[in-house]
Every structure is written in C-alpha cells, then in structure tokens.
C-alpha cells in the first residue's frame, strides 16, 4: 500500500459522512481549469488554521486519484453538473503529502527531507515496477529524474497535493541547513522545466505567505490564493454566510449569536466563518471562544 501515491478516498468519505458536510466540490471545477496550464497549475492556498484546508485536499485526492473509484460519491455533489466532471475523475497519479504529519512523526527532525525523498521514491518504485528507478538520497535531483523517467517511458503525469507545505519553515526557522535542504527539494521538483512538463497540477496549502520563503525566485512559479486576494476561491474558503444560515435553520440555532462570535473575514463580497467553530456551535448549541 502506498504512503503518498494514488491513495484511496477513505478520508474524504469520512468527511462526507460527518454530521455536518458543506458541499465545496465546485472547487474541483476551478482546479480542472488549471490542469496542465503552466502559469496556472502551481497553486498555493494560504489561510488560517481550521479553515478546511485538509478537507479540501482529501476531496481533491478522492476526485483525481487513480487509486479509488469516487464516481458514486461525486455523482451526488455539485461538481457532477460541471462540464469537466468526467474528464479528470480518478484519472491522475496523485502524490498527496501531509508535511505536518511526517514532521511530527519523526523523532529526529534533521532527517525530514531525507525521509520525504525516501518515501516518495518507494511509492514510485512500487507502483512503476517495470521502470528501473535509481535511488540516491544524496542527489537532490533524483526524485525529479525519477518522475521524468516515468513520464518519458510510459507517458504518466502527476498531481501533487501538499498539506502544510511550510511546516519546516515554521517549526525549524533557525535551522538554516534543514530549511535550505527543503527549499532545494521543492526547487528541484517544481522549478525545472523538464520535470514541470511531467506535472499536471500542484495544489499546496500553508499558513504563512509563500513570499516569505520564496528567495531568489525559488517558488515564484506559484500563484498564491490568500485571505486578502483569494483570486476567485473565496466561496471555497470557510463557510459562507448563506451556508451558516442554512445550518442554523436545520439545527434551530441562533444565527445572530453565531455571527457575533464567528464572523471573522470578508473576502471580496463574501462573508466567511471558521468552519470548525461553526460546526461545534451548531452541534452543541453553545457559543464562545
């Protein structure tokens, strides 16, 4: 079973079956339009904690991954009415990485980049057994070369979904060696035109602005979608006011109290609420921090 490559849809099913689920599947229609387009396919979504970043990634994995059949799930969601719906449904090789999970699982943080490269390589090796992939953890380009080789021999392309991509910069900001090592990995994977030609989409989420870590044009291929400039993603970040009103009607809760406590952002003309706080308030009937 792969750790990162072509995972199943279990996590999204868990979100879908929760007591409260808000359909944000039209986000897929946005990402579908960016697939394979050089100036659009590198997406970095920056937003605060508890604003549904992980749920969105689980949905994108469930939709794109060749490792599952998600048609019965998405047939019932809004994206099913989008003209691009069937074009990409479960037709991509998806590498889905939770950087924070890997980081917290390591006692020795200094080997973070080494283990990340090792785990991705093993997934590639085990899933593409007919291709001779060389492993050299000391070579910063060997992962990119593996992806290029797979593409050149069998024309397979990849989507990267990365959760909390900036965890190393946040947690190890004083460890220059580790941060530089991680930056080099990202540059080798995404900056090179040769490997970029093998990638259909990169959708990564973080907390702090990408420009803070983008030195010497390292990550300048990414378009940042944040709380100041959501670039059309405002309806998919948090719960909208109409969605919260709908929940209050369904669960007979006081919308004005929820608005008082949890109405935190206005993006363009869209009022946004923290999903986790709203769900807890709606289910419990209690309001506060």
Segments predicted by a language model, with ranges:
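Phosphate-binding site recognition
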Residues: 1-289
């Amino acid at each position: 079973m792969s750790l990162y490559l072509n995972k199943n849809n279990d996590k999204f099913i868990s979100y879908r079956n929760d007591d409260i689920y808000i359909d944000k599947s039209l986000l897929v229609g946005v990402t579908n339009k960016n697939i394979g387009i050089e100036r659009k396919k590198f997406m970095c979504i920056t937003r605060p904690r508890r604003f549904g970043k992980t749920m969105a990634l689980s949905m994108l994995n469930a939709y794109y991954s060749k490792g599952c059949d998600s048609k019965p799930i998405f047939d019932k969601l809004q994206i099913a009415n989008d003209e691009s719906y069937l074009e990409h449904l479960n037709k991509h090789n998806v590498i889905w990485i939770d950087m924070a999970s890997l980081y917290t699982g390591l006692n020795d943080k200094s080997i973070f980049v080494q283990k990340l490269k090792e785990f991705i390589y093993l997934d590639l090796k085990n899933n593409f057994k007919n291709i001779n992939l060389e492993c050299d953890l000391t070579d910063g380009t060997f992962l990119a070369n593996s992806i290029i080789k797979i593409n050149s021999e069998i024309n397979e392309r990849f989507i990267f979904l990365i959760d909390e991509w900036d965890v190393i910069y946040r947690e190890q900001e004083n460890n220059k060696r580790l941060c530089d090592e991680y930056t080099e990995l990202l540059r080798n994977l995404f900056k090179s035109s040769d490997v970029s030609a093998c990638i259909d989409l990169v959708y990564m989420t973080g907390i702090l602005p990408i420009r803070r870590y983008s030195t010497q044009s390292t990550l300048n291929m990414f378009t940042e979608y944040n709380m100041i400039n959501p670039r059309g993603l405002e309806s998919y970040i948090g719960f909208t006011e109409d969605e919260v009103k709908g929940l209050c009607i369904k669960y007979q809760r006081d919308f004005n109290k929820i608005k008082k406590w949890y109405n935190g952002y206005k993006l363009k003309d869209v009022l946004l609420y923290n999903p986790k706080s709203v769900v807890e308030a709606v289910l419990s009937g209690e309001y506060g921090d």
